[in-house]
């Protein structure tokens, strides 16, 4: 009887390993994962998927509804022989980023009262600092050209070490505060130095942040750095996940960037770590859909 139990236990373990690889990824991060890539590209609404398999010095091109070639900025961006999609990833050291000029954004320029968006990325973050992963976000030029963007760790308004999804209608800070406060922040912390899947969705009403395909709601809470402003003597109380934002996205003229955004002081909010894939959809994916395209070790 004990022998039968051992055999059944081993068989169950092998089955779970097989299912995990089939649904989410593979343990060998140095080879292309076509199963996962096919799942990503088969979902309706995909505009672009960058797998970052190109050599340093080359434009990083997407598959989908356009190539959207991302150019290196401030030097060559190294390629690492490790990644959950193509077997490769870009390594960002906190000084470099990739960029696509606004005139070339095309279908990536998502805006409107009821339009939706999903940004999802497969990353290994160092855990050191605020990092912009990707989107159309510019905090300085002409008063700000914010639109949509995926960040890791925005501590000023209760998003430290969390997946943050930023949306803006006006492109400018949120009155009466000095910065834009309109972002969701996941209930979970993003692990440092570990491959994971980070995403946010916006359905025209709510912004939601996900870690590894899982949405964790947050109860209403007092938001840091909001007390003493006009209308908020004791500070603002709100939920960060989901974040209520019915205003829609503005057509604000930002470039599409990966790894950094333009601040008053120049490029900043540099992502440090590896990015093995980045995808944009023109609709809000469901939690079940996001779970099917996560990489879980």
Region roles according to the model:
Residues 26-74, 80-297:
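Extracellular glycan-associated modules
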């Amino acid at each position: 009887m004990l022998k039968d139990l051992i055999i059944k236990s081993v068989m169950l373990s092998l089955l779970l390993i097989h299912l995990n690889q089939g649904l989410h990824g593979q343990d060998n991060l140095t080879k292309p994962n076509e199963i996962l890539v096919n799942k990503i590209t088969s979902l309706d609404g995909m505009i672009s998927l960058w797998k970052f398999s190109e050599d340093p010095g080359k434009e990083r091109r997407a598959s989908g509804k356009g190539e959207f070639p991302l150019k290196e900025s401030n030097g060559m961006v190294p390629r690492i022989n490790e990644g959950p999609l193509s077997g490769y990833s870009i390594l960002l050291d906190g000084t470099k980023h990739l960029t696509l000029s606004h005139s070339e954004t095309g279908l990536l320029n998502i805006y409107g009262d009821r339009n939706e968006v999903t940004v999802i990325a497969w990353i290994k973050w160092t855990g050191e600092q605020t990092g912009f992963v990707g989107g159309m976000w510019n905090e300085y030029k002409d008063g700000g050209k914010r639109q949509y963007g995926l960040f890791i760790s925005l501590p000023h308004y209760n998003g430290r070490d969390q997946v943050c999804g930023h949306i803006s209608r006006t492109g400018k800070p949120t009155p009466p505060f000095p910065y834009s406060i309109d972002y969701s922040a996941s209930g979970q912390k993003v692990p440092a130095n570990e491959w994971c899947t980070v995403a946010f969705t916006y359905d025209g009403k709510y912004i939601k942040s996900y870690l590894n395909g899982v949405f964790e709601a947050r109860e209403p809470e007092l938001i840091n750095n909001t007390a003493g402003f006009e209308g908020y003597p004791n500070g603002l109380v709100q939920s960060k996940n989901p974040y209520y934002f019915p205003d829609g996205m503005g057509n604000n003229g930002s470039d599409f960037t990966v790894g950094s955004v333009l601040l008053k002081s120049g490029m900043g909010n540099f992502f440090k770590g590896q990015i093995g894939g980045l995808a944009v959809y023109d609709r809000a994916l469901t939690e079940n859909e996001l779970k099917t395209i996560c990489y879980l070790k």
